[in-house]
């Protein structure tokens, strides 16, 4: 099992647009073989002192995959290529943290 935390840096003020596109994508990804969990998240405003600063132009994606092979297949899926084309101009940078259970 692999856990993935994707950080998507969004063009200023355009997170709602990206979320609309992303919500179209989610059911397709969740139907992929080996996808255990896949969903968008944004920073919550809380009174917790040690929380990192809220980032209004960042979208996080919390993922869980059955295997490295499933994750690699996901990155090559046709709907992912279509999504990437639709969000040109909205997404500035994507970074992944790929984690394994300790």
Report the location of each language-model feature.
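Generic N-terminal initiation segments characterized by hydrophobic and/or small/turn-forming residues
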Residues: 15-16, 22, 56, 68, ...
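Generic structural signal for secondary-structure transition and capping sites
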Residues: 27-30, 34, 70, 92-96
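Short amphipathic alpha-helical segments
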Residues: 14-40, 78-83, 87
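Glycine-rich beta-strand-turn "strand-cap" elements at beta-sheet edges
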Residues: 39-57, 82-102
């Amino acid at each position: 099992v692999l856990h993935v935390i994707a950080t998507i840096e969004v063009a200023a003020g355009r997170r709602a647009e990206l979320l609309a596109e992303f919500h179209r994508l989610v059911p397709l990804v969740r139907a992929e073989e080996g996808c255990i969990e896949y969903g968008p998240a944004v920073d919550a405003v809380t009174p917790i002192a040690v929380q990192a600063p809220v980032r209004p132009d960042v979208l996080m994606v919390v993922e869980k995959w059955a295997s490295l092979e499933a994750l690699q297949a996901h990155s090559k899926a046709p709907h992912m290529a279509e999504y990437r084309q639709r969000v040109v101009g909205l997404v500035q940078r994507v970074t992944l943290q790929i984690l394994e259970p300790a």
